[in-house]
A protein has these predicted regions:
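Phosphate/nucleotide-binding beta-alpha loop and adjacent structural elements of enzyme active sites
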Residues: 1-204
Length: 204
């Protein structure tokens, strides 16, 4: 099955609005946090081509603790993007603390979530090709990108967040490793902006 868009870490769908609007193919949105899921479902309820998967994607099928900013703390922290901070590492969330973002441990919720590997996701939805894969998972991008069998699935473009690749607000050898991996599968690598990378498959 072909998907025009697969988004891992879809949040409420707000930042995907433009991508969703220009799609004519099937869309798969993945999001593990309940209050984000509720908004995501509401925001996309009239689009029949969208399927929403309630889980996290990592390198294996498992159930594990997931940390995110409490819904009740988002307005207190006065940053709209706080609802998008979710991670398998509590430290990653606390490391966002700054003068203007006074997050504390009491602002963090923990929940056991179901995780699928990318391979299991592909098998579940019988995915053979993806026009655009977007990954925004607060530092878990490395495990996902490393686990993909690029020879068995056609992915035209991958957009992924780079700013937390090796640690919170740190880019290092893991990012270099993934860039080299994508280059080995004949992808062109470019900075989309200061936080994200675009990898485009070259079929020539």
């Amino acid at each position: 099955m072909k998907f025009g868009l697969v988004s891992i870490g879809s949040h409420t769908g707000y930042w995907l609005k433009h991508e969703i609007e220009k799609q004519s193919e099937k869309i798969l949105l993945i999001e593990p946090v309940k209050h984000n899921l509720d908004e995501l479902k509401e925001n996309t309820k009239n689009i029949n081509s969208i399927t929403i998967e309630e889980c996290a994607i990592t390198d294996s099928d498992q159930t594990k603790p997931f940390y995110y900013v409490k819904h009740s703390s988002i307005s207190k922290l006065k940053k709209h993007w706080a609802s998008g901070i979710g991670s398998f590492s509590k430290k990653h969330i606390l490391d966002h603390k700054s003068k203007n973002f006074q997050i504390e441990e009491s602002d963090i919720e923990t929940v056991e979530i179901n995780c699928l590997s990318f391979k299991s996701l592909v098998e579940k939805y019988n995915i053979h090709s993806i026009d655009k894969l977007i990954i925004d998972v607060e530092g878990a991008e490395y495990k996902i990108l490393k686990s993909i069998d690029y020879s068995s699935i056609k992915i035209d473009q991958i957009i992924f967040e780079k700013k937390h690749f090796d640690n919170t607000f740190f880019e290092g050898p893991k990012l270099k490793e993934i860039k080299n991996l994508l280059l080995s599968f004949n992808c062109k690598i470019e900075n989309l902006d200061k936080e994200n990378i675009l990898a485009t498959k070259n079929y020539l």
